[in-house]
Amino acid sequence: MQNETRSLWPHKDLLDVDQLSKDELLHLLDTAAQFHEINRRPVKKVPTLKGKSVILFFAEPSTRTKTSFDVAGKRLSADTFSLAKSGSSLQKGESLKDTALTLEAMNPDVLVIRHSSSGAARFLAERLACGVVNAGDGWHAHPTQALLDCYSLRQVWGDTFEGRTLCILGDIAHSRVARSNVKLLTSLGVRVRLCAPRTLLPAGVGNWPVEVFTDLDAAVRDADAVMCLRLQLERQQAGLLPDLREYSNRYCLTPRRLELAKPEAKVLHPGPMNRGLEIASSIADAPASLVLDQVAAGVATRMAILFLLATRTDGGR
């Protein structure tokens, strides 16, 4: 497996999903499936990355993604080290570049970074010799979330993405998850619909390869899957949406609305959820929900990413 992977994986970094060819994407998902199977065993730890080191540099708050990467690294027997902005020299005025160069002097094999500035991961990848994984940069991209979402859908759909319809619902304007999912899923032939109040749709969305809706009933009709996004409550304070009750009345995914989708439609949510606001509790806990499947897929997918980058062909970008 390792020799084959080295011959197939040329990328030093994972910055966004559009850097991957279809063959590379499928190879990554197939690798994740192998790790997913390992994660179901009584003994989940494998020596695949023993002796490798992974630094988790989260300059923006995170619980789910950071924990998922930490678990992924440890299950591969890598040494993982966590650094948050509150405990780093960034708080003392040190530049991002100098902080990263200091970390690289410790010779990690992979640096996983989350940062509030769009482009931060690329900035580091262009300057550091170690592999860099973008765990979210501003509103720009969240490639590992899109990859685990794709993996979760593949578990249901198989490889028949072409012609499927996915509705992404919620705060699209400020969502790096939506942006990466649109890029990835449309490249596989999925028809993507975006649904949000006009104030939560991004500028230039008319140029995206999607259909845009402000009416949720129309957006979910005959969809194969619906992805709800977390509503960031500070958006109401900024005047970007009406009061929360009105938002819930118009944009909460309820059983009645899900019935408008196809009978076998699945529901996704990147978490954390605001139950009763963007998604009804009965839907979040229903058999149609893939929310917990996404969590399991996240560990397996991130194991695959760390493995592929840490054992990559030298010289790839």
Curated annotation (Swiss-Prot):
This is Aspartate carbamoyltransferase catalytic subunit. L-aspartate binds at residues 92, 176, 230. Heterododecamer (2C3:3R2) of six catalytic PyrB chains organized as two trimers (C3), and six regulatory PyrI chains organized as three dimers (R2). The keyword Transferase applies. It catalyses: carbamoyl phosphate + L-aspartate = N-carbamoyl-L-aspartate + phosphate + H(+). Belongs to the aspartate/ornithine carbamoyltransferase superfamily. ATCase family. Catalyzes the condensation of carbamoyl phosphate and aspartate to form carbamoyl aspartate and inorganic phosphate, the committed step in the de novo pyrimidine nucleotide biosynthesis pathway. Coiled coil: none annotated. The gene is pyrB. GO terms for biological process: 'de novo' pyrimidine nucleobase biosynthetic process; 'de novo' UMP biosynthetic process; amino acid metabolic process.
